[in-house]
């Protein structure tokens, strides 16, 4: 454990950010899995709506630096192919 006051604060902030980032990533993954589940059940109407939500969450995660922008683009592209197939 850190002894210096500023190091204690940084450790606390780091833990808070880690928890927040984990929450956002989990929400993002859930949205992607929802789209994939709807596509596999041939519910394309709801899949298109879920794709919009998942796309927004992927973009936001990329903007915040949680995932790389190219990774977000790649995931969105693959989801779009599945939804439009």
From Swiss-Prot:
InterPro entries assigned to the protein according to its UniProt record, in alphabetical order: Ribosomal_bS20, Ribosomal_bS20_sf
HAMAP family (UniProt xref): Ribosomal_bS20
Species for this entry: Bacillus cytotoxicus (strain DSM 22905 / CIP 110041 / 391-98 / NVH 391-98)
Protein name: Small ribosomal subunit protein bS20
GO molecular function terms attached to this record: small ribosomal subunit rRNA binding; structural constituent of ribosome
One GO location term (cellular component): small ribosomal subunit
Family: Belongs to the bacterial ribosomal protein bS20 family.
GO biological process, one term: translation
Region named Disordered: 1-22
Function: Binds directly to 16S ribosomal RNA.
Alphabetic keyword roster: Ribonucleoprotein, Ribosomal protein, RNA-binding, rRNA-binding
PANTHER family per record: 30S RIBOSOMAL PROTEIN S20, SMALL RIBOSOMAL SUBUNIT PROTEIN BS20C
Pfam families: Ribosomal_S20p
